[in-house]
Design a protein with these regions (language model features):
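Short helix-terminating capping/connector loops at secondary-structure junctions
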Residues: 108-111, 144-150
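Charged, low-complexity intrinsically disordered regions
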Residues: 1-29
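The conserved Walker
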Residues: 120
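Conserved pre-motif I regulatory segment
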Residues: 25-117, 126
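Motif I (Walker A/P-loop) of helicase-class P-loop NTPases
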Residues: 124-139
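Secondary-structure transition/capping motifs at alpha-helix termini
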Residues: 47, 138, 142-143
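Conserved Walker A/P-loop ATP-binding site and its immediately adjacent core
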Residues: 126-127, 146-162
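Hydrophobic, Leu/Ile/Phe/Ala-enriched alpha-helical segments that form helix-helix packing faces
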Residues: 21, 65-69, 135-139, 162
Length: 162
């Protein structure tokens, strides 16, 4: 059931993000740098001028993470559930229904964590590149440092496959 709940959470996030992206509302909630990047990555005339573009799964991953981090300002795993799909906390059997909320308050969950579930060969590295660029450019151009963006990264990749 845990995987089912996680996938349903991802679907709920995407439903909100896709609606806001298509309506243009998302562009008003992000920084000017993010707005420019999103237009360059996902909008006309740019996408028709390039030979290669992000595919739907990559776009979904990038937009979801940007939405959670920059728009909702998520600080931990529990906040994702509380802000996007509180009803899924009750259905989750991560630790037993009653314990899930308290367990997600533990210090090991007390930082932003984003998971991108993509199969081998579907472009996870391109998603990571985009997210690193998004973080670096926003960190470099923030007038007041918010702590939401960074120029420092540690990427741990087992073997040859990320």
């Amino acid at each position: 059931m845990q995987n089912n709940v996680s996938l349903r959470l991802a679907k709920r996030i995407w439903e909100v993000v896709e609606k806001e992206f298509e309506s243009g509302e998302l562009f008003e909630k992000v920084s000017p740098i993010t707005k420019e990047l999103l237009r360059f990555w996902f909008c006309e005339p740019f996408i028709s001028q390039r030979q290669f573009n992000f595919h739907k799964g990559q776009k979904q991953s990038i937009l979801n993470i940007i939405y959670l981090h920059e728009v909702l300002k998520i600080n931990n795993v529990l906040e994702i559930y509380e802000q996007v799909a509180p009803d899924l906390l009750l259905e989750s059997d991560l630790f037993g229904a009653k314990e899930t909320r308290n367990s997600l308050k533990e210090s090991r969950y007390d930082l932003p964590k984003y998971l991108v579930k993509m199969a081998t060969g579907t472009g996870k590295t391109w998603v990571m590149h985009a997210l690193l660029i998004w973080q670096i450019l926003n960190a470099k151009n923030e007038e007041e440092k918010s702590g939401r963006f960074t120029k420092n990264f540690l990427i741990v990749a087992p073997g040859l496959i990320v």
